[in-house]
Amino acid sequence: MPNGSRCPDCGSSELVEDSHYSQSQLVCSDCGCVVTEGVLTTTFSDEGNFREVTYSRSTGENEQVSRCQQRDLRRVRDLCRILKLPLTFEDTAISYYQKAYQLSGIRAARLQKKEVLVGCCVLITCRQHNWPLTMGTICTLLYADLDLFSGTYMQMVKLLGLDVPSLCLADLVKSYCSSFKLFQASPSVPAKYVEDKDKMLSRTLLLVELADETWLVTGRHPLPIITAATFLAWQSLRPSDRLTCSLAQFCKLANVDLPYPAASRLQELLAVLLQMAGQLAWLQVLKLNKRSVVKHIGDLLQHRHMLVRTAFRDGTAEVETQQQQQQQQGQGQGQQDEVGDGPFDLPKRKRRASPTPLLPPCMLKPPKRTHTLPPESAVTGDEDISDSEIEQYLRTPQEVRDFERAQAASQAAMRVPNPP
């Protein structure tokens, strides 16, 4: 019992010291009454012996989120809710933003890049969960520049070391075609333009697969080719009523934006269909063009695997085929059937046109290269040649003697006076 104290409640002298965490207490062992307790906080005199902890060594619990980061986090949540993404997507996008914001290359960036970072986090989350969403859609919602967005997106993926799978084209076709306002009759859409969603979607998928097989999709933005394929699928289902409708009118009816390269992708896809139509026997008698071939898209898609093999040849095997033909011509095979009697006669039997090589459009129609002309030389050939330079052209002793003899004769002729 310290100092002969007693419990004020029961009067017991059995008092023990009990340390409660960092606060010492004097407790009665009989009734449990706390008789005295120490001071939990320190006094000013005690704090004089303590050492202050710097911010760099602290736990960072008192650190506050900046206003810019708070605003961007709210924008991440708002963007996920506008796109109607699941809550798990929202949490993942927020975590990606917080990780990216700690990087020095992004934290010290300008304000426009931080605003674009919001869309990059949402796009990465959607790509990882195989959610069909394009970069252009987010740029439209954020009013962001596409070049700045793509650069920030690649930088973020590289710095964070993320594994982002490529976008599935079939899922993108389904989500993009679902936004078309052509599946229900309305005052802005006449009844002849309304189409069944499943039929239009299935035919659009087949056209996009055909474009992929013929190198029209590789290295290009997907939305223009999907827009062109959707337009052709919509026209081919009821060609009598829809052939007069242009691509711009179709996009206006569907309430979607017309991508700039969609018209070029449409012409390329029509050229492929026209090439395939020349391989079908019942279509060879018809003089088809890019307008009338739309009526037969159903037949072309039904036999597209066979038609692609017959209408196009593999570009990689083209060189081997040419070498084989050269060897056969060198051996003299088939020369009597195709060449006339005279040396300048035309072939008697006309050869069949070879199929178009199956190559990307950039290789079939390469851009013209600018040829730089060589600089014009100032040497005309009439300049005087010095004696030291002439010695460079003399190679044999006989040439040296001849030159000396000719030079002496020239000097002697100059010394002879002219006759009066």
Curated annotation (Swiss-Prot):
Q: Give the GO cellular component terms, alphabetically.
A: nucleus; transcription factor TFIIIB complex
Biased composition regions of type Low complexity, renumbered to the chain: 322-336
Which residue positions does Cysteine sulfenic acid (-SOH) occur at?
Answer: C362
Subcellular location(s): the record lists: Nucleus
What are the boundaries of the region Interaction with target DNA?
A: 108-114
For region Required for the formation of a ternary complex with DNA and TBP, the annotated ranges are 358-364
> Which CDD domains did the record assign?
CYCLIN_BRF2
Q: How is it modified after translation?
A: In response to oxidative stress, Cys-362 is reversibly oxidized to cysteine sulfenic acid. Oxidation of Cys-362 impairs formation of a ternary complex with TBP and DNA and down-regulates expression of target genes in response to oxidative stress.
Q: Which Gene3D superfamilies match?
A: 2.20.25.10, Cyclin-like
GO BP, sorted A to Z: cellular response to oxidative stress; regulation of transcription by RNA polymerase III; transcription preinitiation complex assembly
Q: Where are the zinc fingers (TFIIB-type)?
A: 3-36
Q: Provide the assembly information.
A: Component of TFIIIB complexes. The TFIIIB complex has two activities, alpha and beta. The TFIIIB-alpha activity complex is composed of TBP, BDP1, and a complex containing both BRF2 and at least four stably associated proteins; this complex inhibits the transcription by pol III via its phosphorylation by CK2; YY1 facilitates the TFIIIB-alpha complex formation. Interacts with TBP; this interaction promotes recruitment of BRF2 to TATA box-containing promoters.
Role, per record: General activator of RNA polymerase III transcription. Factor exclusively required for RNA polymerase III transcription of genes with promoter elements upstream of the initiation sites. Contributes to the regulation of gene expression; functions as activator in the absence of oxidative stress. Down-regulates expression of target genes in response to oxidative stress. Overexpression protects cells against apoptosis in response to oxidative stress.
Q: Under what name is this protein listed?
A: Transcription factor IIIB 50 kDa subunit
